[in-house]
Each structure stands twice: as structure tokens, then as C-alpha cells.
Amino acid sequence: MSQETKMLPSLSSLLSGTEISSSPVSPSFTNPRTSFHLDDRGTIKLPPLNTSINRPRSVESALRHTVTSLHENSSAYGDDMLKHTQSDSALSSQLNSSQETVDESHENLLLTPLNSKKRDYSVSSKKNDILTPLSAAKSIIIPSASKEKRRAFAFITHSQETFPKKEPKIDNAPLARRKRRRTSSQELSILQAEFEKCPAPSKEKRIELAESCHMTEKAVQIWFQNKRQAVKRQRIATSKSTTIIQTVSPPSPPLDVHATPLASRVKADILRDGSSCSRSSSSSPLENTPPRPHHSLNRRSSTPSIKRSQALTFHLNPQKKTLTPVKTSPNSRVNKLINSIDHSPSKAKRPVSNPSGSPKRKRKFGFKIVDQQPLKDLDPNAFRG
């Protein structure tokens, strides 16, 4: 086989454009041969950027565009190819084949216009679905017509503008409050007079009051409810205050036994009995015991109030109708012995003559009272007799 040497064209031939290129040209590659102009100095000047220089495009990229863009691109593409490849026959034949392929693709696209529309719609929908911070804020603040029924937040409050019409979409507006209606003095007097008659009027009566007071029936009902609650609270407060005053009462003064009229009478009787006893003791020669002073009786009567173990009791004299204080002992037997003594004047104590001269008193039970002397040594033989 004879080896053929392939030579590249010279630079001058490429610049002049007279040499026919022997290299195969792909149908999708455009090779616009622009003639470069040389200056007087021999420098090459590039063409201005305003001239339309199309980039090489493949058949697949051409199929992705719309029909109109493909038509415009194909016409411009064909014109440029015809301008620069008039002398090249091989290139012109390949250009025809490329135009045929473009026409076939053009016909295929014309036959299936729905697919392109679907693609365009999907692309546009994808673009619209992309959310930016600004678009998200706009969608929340200004909801679209299709999302009017949706609520922006779970908690919805009324605003001043949307309260009479519909629910608001957001709650950043100031809260709407109904204006409070103040009753006049004339209306208040009518309602209070009716409340004094009947605290809970019927519905017919409430309607009459609403017409006379220029109010609604519901407003009259609410006024009566509030009035009943206020009266109930006031009644409870007054009852509590009265109970507190009753519980916190001033303490009663202590009972003075000596200040009572009965005690003063008893005291006078005791003094009188004491004086009579002193006279009888001074007249009798056998009893040498001096009478007890009056202050001892007072001290004796006052001591039971101090000591808890002793109690002050009185003995009633049926003839003179006087009370005599009797000192009680915690021993019940001693109390019986003391209270059993008869203090009546008919049975007065008679002094018994004692030959030895020592004053001895004989009691009911035969107890012997020995003279009160300081303790001495006890003689056990003295008790045998």
C-alpha cells in the first residue's frame, strides 16, 4: 500500500481563503471564514464585535429551543454558511445535508407542539415554585386569591378592619374592642328602680326596659346580672365584717367578790360576830385567848382566791339568814367534819371547867385539843392511859 502524506495548508492560504479546505467538516460545526484585513504595517485587524458570529451548536441544543427561535437561528445559520462557502463544493453539499436535518427536526417539532408547551409549562412552574425570602414574606403578608380560605396562623384574632366583615389572615393588626356603652343618669335611675322592685325581671319586662332605656334586651339582661353579683358581694363583705366585730369583743372586768352586796353583808356579819365573841371571851374567866383581829379574817377570806387547792365556801345560818365563810380542805372527810358542825346560837359552846387550868375543848367526836406549845420529846408511856 502506498502511503499518502497529508500536508496541512499554509497560513497564507488560510488567510487569503483561496485554498479549499480538504478536512471534513461536521454538519453541526460552523466555520465562518472571515477575511482578515491587513494594515499598511502588515498587522491583522480583527472584525468588530458587533458582527454576528454564531457559536457552533449541536443538533440536540437546537431541538431544545422553541420553533420560532429554531427558525430564526436556522435562517441566520444558512446565510452565514452561504456567504463563506461559495467556492467549497464539498462544504456546500454538507451544508445542504445539515439543512435537511434541521428541516426534518423542524417538521418533527411542528408535528408535536403539545410536548413543547408541556415542557415550557413545567419549566415556568418550576421557576414559580422556587421560594426566596422576599417571595415568602410577600406570600404571607399579601395572600393570593387562591389562598383566601387558608389561615396564615393557628390563632386568629379580630382586627379593627376585618372584625365586621370576616376573619383576618394575620394577627399583627391591633385588637378590635367593642365600644363600651355608658348608661345615662336617667336610664340608670329607671334600671335601679326596677331592680329594687324585682332583681330578676322576666323577658317581657326586659324588653319594655330596653325600649324605655334605648338599649337592647341582651344589654338589659347583662346589667341585671352584674347588679345581682355586686349586691351579693356587698352582702358577703358586710356579713364578714359583723362576724369579726362580734368575735373581737372587749374582755369583761374580773369579778370582785368583796365588791358584791352579798359579800359586804357577810363581812359586816362576820365583824359583828367577832365583836360579840370578844365580849364573851373577856367576860369569861376560863378563856384567856385574845380575840382574833379583823384583818386576819380579811386575809383568810382573800387567801382562797390565791391558792388553787383551797375553795371559799359559805355556811348559811337559817335564823339570821347570814353566810359564814368556811375554809375547805382538799380532803373530802375533813370537809364533812367541818360542814357538820352546827353554828346555831341556840347550841352555844359551853366552856368546860378544867381543874388543871389548861383550856380544853370537847368536840362532838371527843377529840381533845391540847394547848399549842412548841414540840418536845415525846414520851411513849403518856399514851397508855
Swiss-Prot record:
Residues 176-235 bind DNA. PROSITE patterns: HOMEOBOX_1, HOMEOBOX_2. It comes from the Eukaryota. Induction: Transcriptionally activated by SWI4-SWI6 heterodimer. Gene3D superfamilies: Homeodomain-like (1.10.10.60). Residues 1-57, 87-113, 235-259, 271-385 are annotated as: Disordered. It holds the Pfam family Homeodomain. It is found in: Nucleus. GO terms for molecular function: DNA-binding transcription factor activity, RNA polymerase II-specific; RNA polymerase II cis-regulatory region sequence-specific DNA binding; RNA polymerase II transcription regulatory region sequence-specific DNA binding; sequence-specific DNA binding. Residues 10-23, 87-99, 275-284 have a biased composition (Low complexity). Residues 24-34, 236-249, 299-312, 319-343 have a biased composition (Polar residues). The keyword rRNA processing does not apply. GO terms for biological process: cell differentiation; G1/S transition of mitotic cell cycle; negative regulation of transcription by RNA polymerase II; regulation of transcription by RNA polymerase II. One of its GO terms (cellular component) is cytoplasm. Keywords: Cell cycle, DNA-binding, Homeobox, Nucleus, Repressor, Transcription, Transcription regulation. InterPro entries: HD (IPR001356), Homeobox_CS (IPR017970), Homeobox_DNA-bind_prot (IPR051000), Homeodomain-like_sf (IPR009057). The keyword Phosphoprotein does not apply. PANTHER family: HOMEOBOX DOMAIN-CONTAINING PROTEIN, HOMEOBOX PROTEIN HHEX. Present with 861 molecules/cell in log phase SD medium. Interacts with MCM1. Transcriptional repressor required to restrict transcription of ECB-dependent genes to the G1/M phase by repressing their transcription during the interval from late G1 to M phases. Genes that contain a ECB (early cell box) element in their transcription regulatory region are transcribed only during G1/M phases. In vitro, is capable of binding to the DNA of the leucine tRNA gene. This is Homeobox protein YOX1. It comes from Saccharomyces cerevisiae (strain ATCC 204508 / S288c).
